[in-house]
Amino acid sequence: MAGLLSTFDTFSSRRSESINKSGGGAIIPGQRSTVSVFILGPSVTDDADKLLIATTFLAHSLDTDKQHSQRGGFLVSLLAMAIRSPELYLTTNGVNADVKYVIYNIERDPKRTKTDGFIVKTRDMEYERTTEWLFGPMINKNPLFQGQRENADLEALLQTYGYPACLGAIIVQVWIVLVKAITSSAGLRKGFFNRLEAFRQDGTVKSALVFTGDTVEGIGAVMRSQQSLVSLMVETLVTMNTSRSDLTTLEKNIQIVGNYIRDAGLASFMNTIKYGVETKMAALTLSNLRPDINKLRSLVDIYLSKGARAPFICILRDPVHGEFAPGNYPALWSYAMGVAVVQNKAMQQYVTGRTYLDMEMFLLGQAVAKDADSKISSALEEELNVTDTAKERLRHHLTNLSGGDGAYHKPTGGGAIEVAIDHTDITFGAEDTADRDNKNWTNNSNERWSNHSINNHTITISGAEQLEEETNDEDITDIENKIARRLADKKQRLSQANNKQDANSDADYENDDDATAAAGIGGI
C-alpha cells in the first residue's frame, strides 16, 4: 500500500513533466514580421540631437496609425540608445521567432537643410523616403510628458541634468510600464505611478519628464501585443552582468525595476508557499490539503526547471503559466491567505474574495495563525535552547498581542464572494430561522460579519465558530446547500409559472433567476 500511495503522491509532478517534455514532433513555423530598428551613427554627437531622436522614437511608438509591430520597433530603438553596442545587443537578445529586426543607422549630414539634418542610411545606400517618414512633420495627439503641459523646455533640462540623466528617465519609465502591462492591464496606470514615486523622490525622473497617463497606456498596449519586445526586455534582465563594479546608474535602475518584474503574476503562488507551507503549522497534516500540497510540489519542480527565466513565465506567457493560478490549489491557497491576513496586515488588502475561496480553510488559516503555540517553531526552539519559562512568557505576550477578541477577517475584494455572503434575496426557511434564532444569529448577514468587531471586515470568534459548526456538522444549514436549495426552488417556481403567465412574465422570472444563479455560483 505504501508503494501505491507514493505513486499517487508523485503523479502530479510526473504528469506535469510528461506534458511539458519535448516530444520531438513537427515545428509549426510562424510568420515573422520585419521590423525596422534605428540606431545612432557616429556622426550624431550632440546631446540635443540625441534627446530629440529619443523623443521622436517615443512619439512614433504612440502613433496609433502605425502597425503595432513597428511601434514596438521604435520602443526597441529607444531602449537601444542606452546600449554601448546596439547591434550586438539586438543580435544577442533580440533573436525571436516572431520578428526579424532590420537595423538602420541615423547619421548627421551638415549639408542637409531638411529633416533637421538627419539621414537614414545603411552601409550601401541612403533612404530618403524613410528619413522623411521618420523626421517629417508629425502631429502629437497627446503630450508625451506631463511637463509639456507646462511648456517645460527640454533643452533647459538637458543643460541642467545632462543627456544621460534625461535619457535614463525616459527609459526607466518604459521599464516600469512592463511591471503591470502584461499581468494587470486594468491597473496599469495606477501601478505605474505608484512604482514611479520612488524614482521621482530620488531624482531619477524629473517632473517635467514624467509620462502622461495616455503615454503609459499607449506603451502598455504595444507591450501586450508585441511579445518580441517583452522577450527582448526579459533577456536584457537575464543577461545583464550585475556582478560588475562599474554598473551605470541606468543599469542599476533597470535592475531595481527588474525586481518588480520578476515573479509578476505569480503572487498567489509565492504567497501560498510563504504563508501556507513555510510557516510549517500543524494544519498541513490535514488530508484535504494533501492533493494541493502535491500540486504545489509539482509546480515548484516546473518553476525550478525553467532556470533563470522562471520568474518571467507570466510576463513571457509561457504555456505552463496558467498552472500556477491559485484555482489549481484552492484549499491550500485559502488556508495560506487566512494565515497571511493575520501575520501580515498588508495582506488584508489582498483580494481574497474569489470564486474558488474555501471559506472553511480561510477561517482555519486565521485560527492557527492566531494560536500562540502555532507561532513557536520547535526546530528553532531546540537550536536556541529556549527554556520553558521563556516559552510560557512568549505565549503570554503573543496572546496579548492578538487582542483576545478572536476577530476573524472577512474576505476582501472580489464581488462574487461578497454576493454569496451578503445576498439579500437568499432567505431562510422556517426551520432554518428557528435554528438560527436558537443560536442568536441576526437576520442581517452583514451584522454576523461585523458585530462586536474592532476592525473593518471582521467577525467575532463566536460567530466564526457557529459558522464553522454550521458548515461542517449541519447539512441543512450549510451555506452551499442553502444557496443550491434556493436556486432549485426558484427554478421549480419558474417552471410552474410558465404554465400560468404570459411571455413577459416568463422573461421577468428568467432575469430574476439568472441574477440569483450568478450570485450563488459566484459565491461558492
UniProtKB/Swiss-Prot annotation:
Listed GO CC annotations: helical viral capsid; host cell cytoplasm; ribonucleoprotein complex; viral nucleocapsid
- The answer, when asked if Hydrolase is one of the entry's keywords, is no
Q: Where is the composition biased (Polar residues)?
A: 494-504
Q: Locate the region Ncore.
A: 1-404
Q: What does this protein do?
A: Forms the helical nucleocapsid (NC) in a ratio of 1 N per 6 ribonucleotides, protecting the genome from nucleases. The encapsidated genomic RNA serves as template for transcription and replication; encapsidation by N is coupled to RNA synthesis. Forms the encapsidation complex with the phosphoprotein protein P. Before encapsidation, the newly synthesized free N protein, so-called N0, is chaperoned by P.
- Report keywords, A-Z: Capsid protein, Helical capsid protein, Host cytoplasm, Ribonucleoprotein, RNA-binding, Viral nucleoprotein, Virion
Q: What is known of its domains?
A: Ncore is globular and carries regions required for self-assembly and RNA-binding. Ntail is an intrinsically disordered monomeric domain in the C-terminus.
Whichever gene encodes this chain, its name is N
Q: Spell out the protein name for this chain.
A: Nucleoprotein
Q: Where is this region: Interaction with the phosphoprotein?
A: 462-471
Could you tell me which residues belong to the region Disordered?
Answer: 489-524
Q: Hey, which family's this protein in? A: Belongs to the paramyxoviruses nucleocapsid family.
Q: Where in the cell is it found?
A: Virion; Host cytoplasm
- Give the residue ranges for region: Homomultimerization: 440-461
Which positions in this protein are listed as binding RNA? K180, K190, R195, Y260, Y350, R354
Q: Which GO terms describe its molecular function?
A: RNA binding; structural molecule activity
**Positions of the UniProt region annotated as Ntail:** 405-524
- Assembly with partners or alone: Homomultimer; forms the nucleocapsid. Binds to the viral genomic RNA. N0 interacts with the phosphoprotein (via N-terminus); this interaction allows P to chaperon N0 to avoid N polymerization before encapsidation. Interacts as N-RNA template with the phosphoprotein (via C-terminus); this interaction positions the polymerase on the template.
Indicate the principal place this protein occupies in or around the cell.
virion
Q: Where is the composition biased (Acidic residues)?
A: 505-515
Source organism per entry reads Human parainfluenza 1 virus (strain Washington/1957) (HPIV-1)
